[in-house]
């Protein structure tokens, strides 16, 4: 495949020639996301590249972690694995491919089309948080898995995906075992944003940004206790499960 390059003020996009219009829309979304993020945190000052893949196989070949994460992900969240961030690039599926992965339930297409913004938010938070990827190194893989709910959750919340995740959350609550708190690596992509949504609703957006960018504790439950002070972790878990149920029922 011959790569074509498109540019905007702060981003470049490398893509197949047939994805030229999609690339323009991705760049516009990324510029909007950068402007919105700048109100909450310091966005990357260097140019970030969006590498737009025309198939899941191409994405997996470029980012071998993607099929691993796909295998771990719960069935309800698997379709929303749309890419992966590196230190200076985000690799993602072309919007036309994302659209083909959407289910018929409300919000599925919208959530998928916001994937570039979510991946960029993950990259931005990973730059500020030394424990989160990118980059993902073998030595830090266990910590990355333990804190996957933070990495995926901050991207979902900051990009505005969380409201669109409601039908998928409802499906997840009906399928499989009871979700853990914080969400496990298999549920991080779908349920991680709900933790940030709850935190922002209770304490404001800056509290959620602090969770995304501050080094987490070795024990995720200690990270949660620090993020939600003033009540027991058991009580916070109950509030979170009630919040999940509200999201699922909306």
Model regions and ranges:
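Acidic/histidine-rich, surface-exposed loop or edge segments in extracytoplasmic proteins
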Residues: 4-22, 95-101
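Zn2+-dependent metallopeptidase catalytic core
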Residues: 18-78, 106, 113, 117-120, ...
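Zinc-dependent metallopeptidase catalytic helix centered on the HExxH motif
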Residues: 71-170
């Amino acid at each position: 495949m011959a790569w074509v390059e498109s540019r905007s003020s702060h981003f470049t996009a490398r893509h197949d020639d047939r994805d030229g219009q999609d690339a323009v829309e991705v760049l516009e979304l990324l510029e909007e996301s950068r402007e919105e993020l700048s109100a909450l945190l310091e966005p990357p000052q260097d140019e970030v590249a969006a590498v737009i893949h025309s198939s899941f196989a191409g994405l997996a070949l470029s980012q071998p972690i993607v099929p691993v994460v796909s295998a771990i992900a719960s069935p309800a969240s698997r379709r929303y694995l749309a890419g992966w961030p590196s230190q200076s690039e985000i690799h993602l599926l072309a919007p036309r491919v994302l659209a083909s992965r959407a289910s018929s339930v409300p919000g599925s297409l919208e959530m998928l089309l916001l994937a570039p913004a979510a991946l960029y938010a993950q990259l931005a938070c990973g730059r500020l948080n030394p424990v989160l990827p990118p980059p993902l190194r073998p030595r830090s893989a266990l910590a990355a898995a333990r804190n996957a709910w933070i990495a995926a959750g901050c991207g979902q919340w900051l990009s505005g995906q969380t409201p669109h995740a409601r039908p998928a959350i409802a499906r997840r609550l009906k399928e499989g075992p009871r979700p853990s708190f914080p969400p496990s690596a298999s549920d991080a992509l779908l349920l991680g944003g709900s933790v940030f949504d709850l935190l922002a609703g209770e304490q404001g957006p800056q509290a959620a940004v602090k969770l995304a960018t501050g080094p987490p504790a070795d024990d995720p439950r200690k990270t949660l206790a620090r993020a939600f002070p003033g009540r027991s972790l058991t009580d916070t878990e109950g509030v979170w499960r009630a919040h999940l149920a509200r999201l699922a029922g909306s």
